C-alpha cells in the first residue's frame, strides 16, 4: 500500500503480544524493512501487561530494548504501545534518551505525560477522550501543549462516541479532534491543522500536493 499510494507510509516493528515467536534474525529483517524509503517509524512496539496469556514481562522488555536500539541506530521515531505497563515503559524509554516518538493511545497519568513530554515524546489521543468516564484524559490533555498532541483512531478498536460499540473507522478521527479542541478552547480546524503538521514533522514526511484527511 505504501508503494502504491503517495499519501500512505509504513512503520515496522514487533508488537509485544507475539514476543518470543519471532525468528532468530527478526532484527535483521526489521532493519532491512526499515530502510525502505516509505518506512517512517519503528512500531508499534512496547509492553502489554493486560492479558495474562501475553509473553512474560522480561521477554517483552528484551524485545522492546532491542527494537529501541534499532530505532536509535536508524534514527527513526517510535510508535509506542503501553498497556498496563506504565512504570516499566517509562523506565525503559529513559534508557534511550536519544529515541523519541509517540506514545500511541496514551493512558498514563498526567505526571507520566509530563515526564515524557520533557523527554521530547508526543502523546496520541483517540476515541476514549469522548467517553463519559474519561476522567484522566482531560487532565492529560491539560498538561499537553498543542505542539505535542497527535490524534488517532486505533481502528478498528476504541471507537469514539456516538459510534462506540461499533467497528471503528479512520474517518472518526474528526470526533477526537472535536473533543480535544473543546478542551483546548480552539476551533477543531485549528487542532486538525496543527496535529497534521506535528505528525508530518515527527515522521519526516514530505507531503504530496493534496493531503488526505488527518488521521494516524
Task: Please tell me what each predicted stretch does.
Residues 2, 90-103, 203-216:
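Short, electropositive alpha-helical surface patch
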Residues 16-119, 131-132, 139-140, 144, ...:
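Divalent metal-binding pocket/active-site signature
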Residues 138-139, 178:
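Active-site phosphate/pyrophosphate- and oxyanion-stabilizing loops and adjacent acidic/basic residues
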Residues 14, 105, 127-129, 153-155:
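Short secondary-structure boundary segments
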Amino acid at each position: 500500500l505504501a508503494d502504491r499510494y503517495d499519501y500512505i507510509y509504513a512503520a515496522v516493528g514487533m508488537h509485544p503480544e507475539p514476543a518470543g515467536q519471532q525468528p532468530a534474525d527478526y532484527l535483521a529483517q526489521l532493519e532491512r524493512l526499515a530502510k525502505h524509503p516509505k518506512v517512517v517509524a519503528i512500531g508499534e512496539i512496547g509492553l502489554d501487561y493486560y492479558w495474562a496469556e501475553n509473553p512474560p514481562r522480561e521477554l517483552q522488555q528484551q524485545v522492546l530494548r532491542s527494537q529501541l536500539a534499532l530505532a536509535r541506530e536508524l534514527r527513526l521515531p517510535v510508535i509506542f504501545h503501553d498497556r498496563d505497563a506504565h512504570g516499566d515503559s517509562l523506565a525503559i524509554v529513559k534508557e534511550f534518551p536519544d529515541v523519541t516518538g509517540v506514545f500511541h493511545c496514551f493512558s498514563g497519568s498526567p505526571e507520566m505525560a509530563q515526564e515524557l513530554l520533557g523527554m521530547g515524546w508526543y502523546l496520541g489521543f483517540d476515541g476514549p477522550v469522548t467517553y463519559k468516564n474519561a476522567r484522566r484524559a482531560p487532565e492529560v490533555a491539560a498538561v499537553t501543549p498543542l505542539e505535542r498532541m497527535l490524534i488517532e483512531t486505533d481502528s478498528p478498536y476504541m471507537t469514539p462516541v456516538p459510534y462506540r460499540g461499533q467497528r471503528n473507522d479512520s474517518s472518526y478521527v474528526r470526533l477526537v479532534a472535536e473533543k480535544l479542541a473543546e478542551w483546548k478552547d480552539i476551533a477543531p480546524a485549528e487542532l486538525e491543522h496543527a496535529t497534521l503538521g506535528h505528525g508530518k514533522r515527527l515522521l519526516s514526511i514530505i507531503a504530496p500536493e493534496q493531503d488526505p484527511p488527518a488521521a494516524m
